[in-house]
Amino acid sequence: MIQHPRIGIRPTIDGRRQGVRESLEVQTMNMAKSVADLISSTLKYPDGEPVECVISPSTIGRVPEAAASHELFKKSNVCATITVTPCWCYGSETMDMSPDIPHAIWGFNGTERPGAVYLAAVLASHAQKGIPAFGIYGRDVQEASDTAIPEDVKEKLLRYARAALATGLMRDTAYLSMGSVSMGIGGSIVNPDFFQEYLGMRNESVDMTEFTRRMDRGIYDPEEFERALKWVKENVKEGFDHNREDLVLSREEKDRQWEFVIKMFMIGRDLMVGNPRLAELGFEEEAVGHHALVAGFQGQRQWTDHFPNGDFMETFLNTQFDWNGIRKPFVFATENDSLNGVSMLFNYLLTNTPQIFADVRTYWSPEAVERVTGYTLEGRAAAGFLHLINSGSCTLDGTGQATRDGKPVMKPFWELDESEVQAMLENTDFPPANREYFRGGGFSTRFLTKGDMPVTMVRLNLLKGVGPVLQIAEGYTLELPEDVHHTLDNRTDPGWPTTWFAPRLTGKGAFKSVYDVMNNWGANHGAITYGHIGADLITLASMLRIPVNMHNVPEEDIFRPKNWSLFGTEDLESADYRACQLLGPLHK
């Protein structure tokens, strides 16, 4: 059984016996317990289980105790450490020197013992040794007897833990390419060095003929298929056929295609994670799956010119429910865009919520909207907006039909209820695919995302000579007047899922205007997640040594390892590039 990755908590202490160490034992160990309690009571794994922490077997005052802690952590699948102390300790003697996992240190801000002095000393040792560590130091002085974790310290501990867990969850998993390069898209030219060295992942690949092989040979669960077909007929609405008359398929052919795309979903899922039912049917090898945390399907054009497209498969893999009930989503990239798949994966592991995959299709200026519709933009839309629309697939959670406190959200599967599932289905239809694009047919996904949701759009790009770089745009979804929406939406493909997005502007750099955001976006795709998580993404990127080339996160929310400041404190973007370049990938 594969263990969850855990956070290791290291209570370090002044090693001097005969009074000093003894007086600090309880306080120091209680700090460790309080951090473990905070993390386990606040954060969850993608399966909904509380995050697990492992505390060192004793306080750490000298090297043998540091070594004992290290041995325990190796056996316990610890993916990151947090060192805590209220006092002076011996810096390089007590530090964790594992170079391939993240480290953080919380030095208690008190006057009785110099926790801050240890923090500064051990962070200097980390910098000297080239092992980055995050420094956490409360803004306000606390009493020595105060066991509460200050709010600013909590925020940093949780931000660090979320990002560190993401590194652990990715490690030793796989990206599965179903097919190869789609239409010359750079992101679907999968780079195994990037996955191995930055994420600790491997790459696997299957030809798209694996889908037809499994269909022809019955390598899927026939009982599940019958149940799925019944559920789809009862719950999934076929949309209006926008094709010209000579391209409209017969009712009989459409019915056959519904059966085909349901099988595609089942096979795509089984390829990613396996299915023990296949072993019962005599297909032991296929039952294992590919241990894929994220996958992509090429589709265009070799598949879609001949077979029904992958829109239904992609939509329901990225959605948190199907005929088997509510479940955690998969992370699945259209057009095998592995870089957008990784962008979705970063978002998912930080939030435990499903992800919107979209083309960053159009910038609509206020002037253009008024010319086309006669409507003057206002509110969050006043400076213009971006049309985010994928060519036929999107998680149904992207409808925004789930709610929290009466507001539209995308939330973890364990918070979802059946009424929200039905609302998503009722507000979505599945039109026959545009056969000028998809000659083999299939069914696309059509909905409109509800407005006023805080979201973050993310994209990972590869830059020759530099490596991966990350860009982040926080903003809000918009709800336009119905007639304005229809006028703008019908200028593209009315059978595809639409999200109207207004990035938050800062007045400088790439965020001077919405046009500048569009103009500086590094690729044709973006991954959109619920919530403003840019600060968490910046922390995660620093752990992986991926520089951030564009973001609109307030400077006070940026949390990177302490030694980043030694690369410069005025121009943080340049310092980030220098630090990542010098330190190199986390897993190299």
From Swiss-Prot:
Localization, UniProt: Cytoplasm
Q: Which domain of life is it from?
A: Bacteria
- Keyword Nucleotide-binding set for record: no
Q: Which UniProt keywords apply?
A: Carbohydrate metabolism, Cytoplasm, Fucose metabolism, Isomerase, Manganese, Metal-binding
Protein residues bound to Mn(2+): E335, D359, H525
Entry keyword GTP-binding: no
Q: Under which pathway is this protein filed?
A: Carbohydrate degradation; L-fucose degradation; L-lactaldehyde and glycerone phosphate from L-fucose: step 1/3
- A single Gene Ontology CC term: cytoplasm
What are the positions of the active site?
E335 (proton acceptor), D359 (proton acceptor)
The record's catalysed reaction(s) read: L-fucose = L-fuculose
Known EC number:
5.3.1.25
Q: Which cofactor does it need?
A: Mn(2+)
Biological process (GO) annotations held by this record are: D-arabinose catabolic process; L-fucose catabolic process
Which molecular-function annotations from GO does this UniProt entry contain? arabinose isomerase activity; L-fucose isomerase activity; manganese ion binding
> What is the documented function of this protein?
Converts the aldose L-fucose into the corresponding ketose L-fuculose.
Protein family membership: Belongs to the L-fucose isomerase family.
Task: State what protein this is by name.
Answer: L-fucose isomerase
Species name for this entry? Streptococcus pneumoniae serotype 2 (strain D39 / NCTC 7466)
What does the record give as the organism's lineage? Bacteria, Bacillati, Bacillota, Bacilli, Lactobacillales
